[in-house]
Amino acid sequence: MIREAQYLQVEEAVKNIMGANLKYEDLARELEKLIGDKYGSLSTDTNPAITNLAHWQEDDIRFLVKEYSGFSNDSIHLFHDALIRLEWDGVKEEVKRNLSEEMGALTNDVPHLELMRRGYKYELGVETEGVEYSQCTEALLTRMRRIFRNSNNAYLCGALLALEATATFEFKGVEKILRALKHKMDGGEIAANSVTGQYILGHVSDSPEGENPEDDHYAGMRSAIGSYISAEKNNDLVRGFVSVCTALNSWWENISIEVYSRKLDLAPSN
């Protein structure tokens, strides 16, 4: 059974937001509330891939990590796609700042993706290069590329805002997945000084307070975009934001279903 109620609620909420003629600061707050209140898979506590971890075996979680790596690998290209099409200098500078951190500005010049690839392969046994992805992951990547190659700058900024707004809770969920895999493997923990540990700390950290990298990215992006959004651009911003949130929410649902369907693929080998 699909959870259609959340999508109907999103649709109704979006209609109300688009009809309210809000100032940018109020608009951003309403969009933030959409994530927490309407999109079940974008919250760590209700994401089905997190809530079902206890029922999955090591190979199931490895599959999930491999599939998510496809989005991680593509994300940096989404920023580059946006940068090519952006005409608003302040937003371009913020995208460049985020890209510099992804390329290792805060991790001793080691790109985040390289930390991910090394850690996943050598510490968690997950290969992320030259792999095939499921249809639902390929559909997500195609959908996101289409969104971030749109030349409407307000729409594009809505997409960028959503990518950053969802990042902290999303990566806290990914951290839970990675730690669950490590525990399934050998009962151990991911050390902070391990390659995977460094990768995690490059994205989320609850200590010290206020030092969460993804929260900083979102605050910077929200501020930069605000300089360019006027009332006539509100609705395009909302459309871009909702497009990304809906794509990610539905992917988490679909990939969780995919894990279970793989477990029930009982065809004998030839």
PLM regions and their residue ranges:
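Short, charged, amphipathic alpha-helical segments
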Residues: 66, 93-97, 235-242
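A structural feature that tracks compact, well-ordered secondary-structure segments
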Residues: 82, 94-98, 171-172, 208, ...
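Membrane-entry segments of alpha-helical transmembrane domains in multi-pass membrane proteins
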Residues: 57-65
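Accessory, usually C-terminal, subdomains that scaffold auxiliary metal cofactors
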Residues: 192-241
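Active-site-proximal alpha-helical scaffolds that flank and shape metal-associated catalytic sites
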Residues: 23-37, 93-206, 246, 250, ...
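Acidic, carboxylate-rich catalytic segments that either coordinate divalent cations
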Residues: 4, 214-217, 228-270
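Short alpha-helical hairpin
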Residues: 7-21, 27-58, 73-76
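Helix-loop segments that flank and shape redox-cofactor active sites
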Residues: 48-57, 75-97, 177-186
